[in-house]
Structures are given as structure tokens and as C-alpha cells.
Amino acid sequence: MKRIFLFLVTNIAVLLTLGIVANLLCAFLYGTSVEQVIGPEWTVLLVYAFVYGMLGAFISLLFSKPIAKMSCGAKTIDGTEGEAERWLVATVEDLARQAGVKTPEVAIYPGAANAFATGAFKNSALVAVSTDIMGQMTKEELRAVLGHEMSHVANGDMVTLTLVQGVLNAFVIVISRVLASVLANAGNGEGGRRRNNGGLYFLLVMVLQLALGILASLIVMWFSRKREYAADAGSAKLLGTPSAMIAALRRLGNLQPGVLPDSLRAMGIAEGKKTSIWSTHPSIEDRIEALQNLGAGIM
């Protein structure tokens, strides 16, 4: 409920901010309001930004669990399938209790070494691990991986990342169109009011939306990498030591992490051996260094 309230408050704040920024820009350039530059479509634009940018991202999150299961072929387990499954469910239950959240659904999916968490609410999440990671890791390493995913759940990272993406989507939609309208109608001599420059306007919208979208993606990736450090630290705290998480990361460094669908990449345990500004995860070496610097005294 707290996250939903935050989502609604953020939506209102974003729309107000966009209105203020757009009006200041038009006042500075033309000495008039954004409604005079863009026309009556301004209100429609704000509604479109809200529905497509904000609600679209949140609706995707609401359906994230069934989408994740279908995209990865994940099968929910209850611990009655065998000894390995029983241990997996019991471990997730224990970590959930320590993290102060309800036990999420537990699933296994076929594929290379990886794991992920998803779900719109921390008390109704899904944690899934691949068959390969179960076979390649020791129980202590796998427990650390599960602790990492449970930290994502407890921290509400799925909602927070969706909120960031939604806010940026709305900014890209509105700012690209405001700038396109300003540039397309520059020097028309009528206070910036839009005239028959439709072709130029739509060309500018496409270019600006692409450029601003790339910038927005970089911000989302940066934020995702920060949340990975927090999830690693959360795993270390749940287990009482960073050593198991360090061992799990080293193990992953010797494997080829499985590729997850784009919608799940940010919530996986690893993305690949290399990292860049486009990566959802820091490099394994940087994550290990951060855990080593965490220090036993902080634990």
C-alpha cells in the first residue's frame, strides 16, 4: 500500500513538474504559456504521458509473474517434488522470515546459471532459479544467491525500478514534444503558436524521443547497478557474512550466466562477465570488492 501511495504521489509530482518546466521554457523563449505554443493538445499530451509512461510501466509490473513464468518456462514448486526442491523452498522461507516479508512463490526454470525475482508487491513476489545454477553451486553459495534475490524483494526494487522507468518515460514523451514544437515553430512571429509545420514537428519528435530515450535508458541502467550492490549487501546481512556471496559471485565468474528476457535482466543475479554503461549489473569484480569493503564490523 505504501508503494502504491508513493506511485500516485510521484505521478502527480511528475505531471506538475513537467507543467512547470514546459511553461518556464515557453515563457523564456516566447513570453507566453505552453498552451499558446502547443495548443489545446497540451492537456491530451499530459494524459498520454501519464497513461503510456506511468500506468503502462506499472501494468507491466502487475503481470510480471505470469510473464516471467511463460518467458522462461519456470515451474512453481512447493517442496514435495524432491530433496533439492524441498531444501530450496525451506531456504527461501527462512530468508523471507529474516527479511520480514511473506514467502514468495519459488520456481525453477531450465537454462544456464542465473536467478531472478519479480512481482508487483514484496509480499506476493516470485523467486526463480535455473536448473544449471542449482547444479553448479554449493548450498551455501545458492543460499547467498537466494539472499540476493530476497533482498531485491524486501527492498521493493521491482516497484522502484518500474517507478523510475515510468517517470523517465513520461519526461521523454512530454519534453521531446515540447522541444519539437518550440523548434518547429521558432520564428513564426506569432508568440510561438504552432502553425503548419507538421512534417518538421513529427521528425523532430522522433529524433528527440530517440535521443532522450537513450539518455533515460542510461539512467535506468545506472540505477539498476546501484540496486545490485544493495542486494549483494542485503544477502551478506541475511547470511551474517559476505563470504558466501563472494564465493557465489566467483563461481558465476567461472560460468557463463544465463541470458534473461529484457524485462527480467535487472532482477537477475548476474548479466555477464563484462560490464558497461548499458549493463544492469556491475562487474563481478566490482561487486566482490564492494562486499570485501563491507567489513565484518558493519555486519
Question: For the regions a protein language model found, what residue spans apply to each?
Answer:
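N-terminal low-structure segments adjacent to metalloprotease catalytic domains
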Residues: M1-A57
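Metalloprotease/metallohydrolase-associated module, dominated by Zn2+-dependent proteases
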Residues: M1-F5, V9, L161, L179-A244
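Active-site His/Glu-centered metal-binding helix of metallohydrolases
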Residues: A13, L146, M150-A154, V167, ...
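Transmembrane alpha-helices and immediately adjacent membrane-cytoplasm interface residues
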Residues: T43-K69, E93, R97, V205-I219
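Peri-catalytic and regulatory segments of divalent metal-dependent proteins
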Residues: S60-V159, G258-P261, W278
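Active-site metal-coordination segments of metallo-dependent hydrolases
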Residues: K75-V89, A216-L238, T275-P282
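Active-site-proximal gating segments in proteases and membrane effectors
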Residues: Q98-S124, N188-N197, W222, A233-M299
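Catalytic Zn2+-binding segment of zinc metalloproteases
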Residues: M150-N169, S243
